[in-house]
């Protein structure tokens, strides 16, 4: 879960991590599936990182010793410091761009990765304690947080339990500046940890026979804090809850952590995701949407099949399929109709997703694969990343802070945006192509694994070279695949239409060939439209034979432009008001639009336009030559005035407004 922010600089013997703090956005979703519940005995754990679209994500490798003993990690915004006690291990991580625009909160957020000791981690799924707890043990402004913890844990942890102990000791000494859920795994076990308040936390060794789906809240119920083999807890976790008068005890006499530390009400954005996630992995679950409590540790229901890695990967694409709820990534839409629209797990706002698969037969130092998407997995294939890789492709580590055609994140994310522009028609077909590509990678994986394991038994360095080579090949294939999707989808949709009020009429005009984008990926719906653009649209609708209008009809018409023949057609057929002077590049006014459109309809369909009185409050501001046209178009409901009954004749039109008008006359 994104907080905000971090930047790592290394100069000489000192590495300084610049971290800017801000409030977290609560939208990440975590999952764990114990190895007894999976089809192949794998232990599975992962999360989505959700915050905002258009935020560069990368896959970056860090060689052993990149961070030196004595180097200091500093959060310059809140003052958190961590001094490295030894040189860093080799690891890879999935950070933000280090070159983000100044108007965007800064930070790297290493987020997730593997190190050479075989520890896989993700940080974090953010959460908040209740107000009463915060008064007793408030978050520490200078404490550790998600922006910093991933880096020093990957750099030094040598086991999953060791990762918990490292983070716990840091919280004991310096406190935590936010609430979080984190997960650490190695070859032997997976640990789940909740950080509740400034100094309180509990971690458990995750049982092999359970599964969990956990959005942004605390989920641990009753925990035996005396079970030192399977539990690591802060010493005052019970005392703080009692002092806050929020302490809740289970029937077994154990502290109920979720009931004691959570806010009283579960956010509906959390309820929708935990409910849909449980039902996705356990189709026979009977837990209702309005359940008083959702358990962290779930059993598979009778009749439900064991969980495959594909099930776990597809969980992060879940959009309430098979339910009565409608997925919405738009908060305003959800608030307007909360019974219908719900926040899904699979969201366009997912910046990256990662799922760790600890596999039987893999070596201790590289115990599994991290499946990864840079961008939302909705329309991006999962790529298997071996734990021992030495490098990633130029496209996967591209640091560009804004759109770059050579960045995997940006190209793949544009595919998500293009599909979201017309999800109704493009969603299923694009997903089918993504899954087909994904399954192709999965089909090749066993042979790659076999050769890698054979090499690993002989020479770990050669095995790492091999896994790096194969990973680069898969990354290259995935990039080319997403480029192909981008090229095809950009012909029928645009990437800047998500949640736009005119999305559907815009798509209609694009697919009918009446309007085109301002470039391959953008429609620019809020950009004003020029006279030449509007005349061109009407010419396309009227199926004008351009060959008949090659001769320039007015001194203001420039030859060789996209609009030349259409402007000649408009002049010859007297479609333009005299005031327009056949100047194509000027922005179109609303009254000019009304006149030109009406003249076109008269020419095309022999439409009869009668004189009529205007009822708009600003009718006196409409030019005499446009009044009949405005009256006709409003009577036919082809155009409308403002909510306060004005026509605003001298205002310009946007491309979106024109698309809506074209849709109206096409009914």
Enumerate the predicted regions with their spans:
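N-terminal secretory signal peptides that target proteins for export/translocation
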Residues: 1-4
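A contiguous strand-loop segment
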Residues: 28-145, 166-291
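Glycine-rich, aromatic-lined ligand/substrate-binding cores of catalytic
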Residues: 244-361
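Substrate-recognition/cap regions that form aromatic- and gly/pro-loop-enriched pockets
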Residues: 329-454
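Histidine-centered catalytic/metal-binding microenvironments
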Residues: 430-492, 510
């Amino acid at each position: 879960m994104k907080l905000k922010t971090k930047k790592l600089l290394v100069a000489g013997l000192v590495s300084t991590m610049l971290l800017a703090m801000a409030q977290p956005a609560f939208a990440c979703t975590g999952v764990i599936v114990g190895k007894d519940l999976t089809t192949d005995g794998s232990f599975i754990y992962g999360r989505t990182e959700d915050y905002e679209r258009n935020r560069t994500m990368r896959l970056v490798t860090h060689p052993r010793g990149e961070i030196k003993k004595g180097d200091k990690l500093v959060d310059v915004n809140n003052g958190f410091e961590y001094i490295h006690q030894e040189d860093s291990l080799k690891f890879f991580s999935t950070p933000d761009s280090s070159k983000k625009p100044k108007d965007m909160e800064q930070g790297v957020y290493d987020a997730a990765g593997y190190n050479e000791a075989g520890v896989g981690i993700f940080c974090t799924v953010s959460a908040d304690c209740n107000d009463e707890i915060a008064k007793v043990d408030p978050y520490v402004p200078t404490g550790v947080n998600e922006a910093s913890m991933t880096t020093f844990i990957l750099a030094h942890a040598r086991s999953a339990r060791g990762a918990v102990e490292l983070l716990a000791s840091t919280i004991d000494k310096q406190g935590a500046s936010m609430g979080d859920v984190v997960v650490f795994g190695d070859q032997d076990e997976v640990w789940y940890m909740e950080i509740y308040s400034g100094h309180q936390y509990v971690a458990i060794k995750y049982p092999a026979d359970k599964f969990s789906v956990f959005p942004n809240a605390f989920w641990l119920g009753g925990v035996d804090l005396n079970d030192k083999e399977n539990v690591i807890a802060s010493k005052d976790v019970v005392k703080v809850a009692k002092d806050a008068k929020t302490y809740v005890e289970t029937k077994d006499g154990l502290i109920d952590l979720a009931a004691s530390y959570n806010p009283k009400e579960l956010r509906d954005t959390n309820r929708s995701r935990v409910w849909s996630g449980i039902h996705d992995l356990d189709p026979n679950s009977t837990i209702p949407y309005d359940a008083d409590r959702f358990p962290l540790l779930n059993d598979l229901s009778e009749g439900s099949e064991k969980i495959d890695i594909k099930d776990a990967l597809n969980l992060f694409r879940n959009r309430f399929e098979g339910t009565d709820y409608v997925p919405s990534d738009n908060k305003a839409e959800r608030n307007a109709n909360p019974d219908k629209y719900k926040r899904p797990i699979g969201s366009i706002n997912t910046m990256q997703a990662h799922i760790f698969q600890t596999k039987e037969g893999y070596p201790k130092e590289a115990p599994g694969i991290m499946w990864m998407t840079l961008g939302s997995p909705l329309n991006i294939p999962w790529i298997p990343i071996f734990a021992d890789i030495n490098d990633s492709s130029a496209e996967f580590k591209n640091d560009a802070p804004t759109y770059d055609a050579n960045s995997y994140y940006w190209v793949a994310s544009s595919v998500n945006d293009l599909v979201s522009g017309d999800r109704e028609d493009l969603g299923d077909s694009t997903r089918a192509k993504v899954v087909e590509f994904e399954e192709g990678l999965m089909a090749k994986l066993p042979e790659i694994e076999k050769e890698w394991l054979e090499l690993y038994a002989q020479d770990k360095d050669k095995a790492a070279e091999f896994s790096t080579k194969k990973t680069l090949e898969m990354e290259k294939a995935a990039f080319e695949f997403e480029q192909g999707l981008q090229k095809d989808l950009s012909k029928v949709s645009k990437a800047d239409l998500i949640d736009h009020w005119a999305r559907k009429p815009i798509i209609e005009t694009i697919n009918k060939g009446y309007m085109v984008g301002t470039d391959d990926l953008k429609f620019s719906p809020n950009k004003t439209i020029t006279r030449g653009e509007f005349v061109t649209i009407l010419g396309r609708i009227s199926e004008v034979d351009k060959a008949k209008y090659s001769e320039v009809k007015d001194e203001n018409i420039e030859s060789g432009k996209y609009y030349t023949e259409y402007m000649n057609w408009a002049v010859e057929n007297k479609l333009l008001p005299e005031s327009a002077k056949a100047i194509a590049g000027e922005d179109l006014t609303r009254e000019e639009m009304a006149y030109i459109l009406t003249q076109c309809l008269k020419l095309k369909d022999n439409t009869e336009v009668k004189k009529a009185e205007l009822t708009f409050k600003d009718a006196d501001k409409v030019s005499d030559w446009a009044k009949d046209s405005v009256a006709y178009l409003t009577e036919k409901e082809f155009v409308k005035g403002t909510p306060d009954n004005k026509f605003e004749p001298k205002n310009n039109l946007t491309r979106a407004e024109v698309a809506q008008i074209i849709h109206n006359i096409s009914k």
